[in-house]
Design a protein with these regions (language model features):
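Metal-dependent nuclease catalytic cores that hydrolyze phosphodiester bonds in DNA/RNA
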Residues: 1-108
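Hydrophobic/aromatic-lined pockets within catalytic cores
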Residues: 29, 119, 139-143, 206, ...
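Short aromatic-enriched loop/helix-cap "lid" or pocket-rim segments at secondary-structure transitions
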Residues: 63-65, 170-174, 232-233
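Accessory terminal regions of nucleic-acid processing enzymes
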Residues: 18-22, 152, 188-236
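Mg2+/Mn2+-dependent nuclease catalytic core
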Residues: 82-196
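Hydrophobic, Leu/Ile/Phe/Ala-enriched alpha-helical segments that form helix-helix packing faces
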Residues: 55-60, 138, 142, 201, ...
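Short catalytic/ligand-binding loop motif for oxyanion handling, primarily in non-cytosolic enzymes
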Residues: 24-25, 32-33, 119-121, 166-170, ...
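Short, solvent-exposed polar/charged micro-motifs at secondary-structure junctions
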Residues: 72-81, 168-172, 228-229
Length: 236
């Protein structure tokens, strides 16, 4: 029976690009380096979303039209794709939890991710495969055991809403008023580039030999040094 590969949108721009060897081992052996971001970023996210859910997306920036964030009654917590194949007709599935999905008043849809990060105009380029992956899920939706993913089409806007600490304006002995700069980085859809990338990832995973250590990967360097030290110990 042909293998159906499974990818999380969030791993496509991080684990997959960071190190081919670590990604290969992670997907085949379920071993994760454990390099998760500090919990404080989740805390920022938990504060940002409730506020922005009450706002019109047009107020976020000039690039977004009138719209509102879709809530849990319209979207399941986890969304999945169905029937996707790469450029070599190999089956794969996408499954994940989108940050922000927007329904615009003109009937179109948008996908936005909130990031507390150093602001840059092209920040969304760092997340281009993640954002397009969510667009592909909504274009070819599937179902989990508990919920069906809705088909949302067309998805006309994708991007990253960036937050960066700016200043503290007031404080008491238990809290403070904290301002953050914001900036929206838009991303154009690129379906062809996405499928080219997925095809390369599946090519990697179908290799029978584990990829070589990456010189620019800290985990590879750490593991390689451990091996070197062990070999020296065995020579004694």
């Amino acid at each position: 029976m042909p293998v159906e590969y499974s990818f999380s949108p969030s791993e496509l721009d991080y684990k997959a690009k960071k190190c081919p060897r670590c990604f290969y081992i992670h997907k085949h052996h379920k071993i994760n380096p454990g390099d998760r971001p500090p919990p404080v970023f989740s805390s920022f996210d938990a504060v940002q979303k409730p506020y922005f859910k009450t706002t019109n997306t047009k107020t976020w920036c000039d690039d977004l039209p009138d719209g509102e964030i879709m809530d849990s009654s319209e979207l399941p917590g986890k969304i999945v794709s169905e029937g996707l194949v790469d450029n070599k007709q190999r089956k794969f599935k996408l499954a994940g939890n989108p940050d922000i999905v927007i329904k615009f008043k003109d009937g179109n849809f948008g996908i936005v991710d909130f990031k507390t990060t150093i602001i840059s105009l092209d920040k969304a380029e760092n997340y281009r495969y993640q954002l397009e992956a969510y667009a592909q899920i909504f274009s070819s939706p599937g179902s989990t055991k508990t919920a069906k993913t809705p088909k949302l089409n067309p998805i006309t806007h994708m991007g990253i809403l960036q937050f960066y600490p700016d200043e503290i304006t007031n404080h008491t002995d238990h809290n403070c008023d904290f301002k953050m700069k914001t900036s929206y980085s838009a991303l154009n859809r690129n379906k062809e580039g996405f499928y080219d990338y997925i095809t390369k990832l599946i090519d990697l995973l179908e290799q029978t030999i584990v990829p070589k250590f990456s010189d620019d990967c800290n985990f590879c360097n750490f593991t390689q040094e451990q091996i070197n030290l062990l070999e020296k110990e065995n020579e004694k």
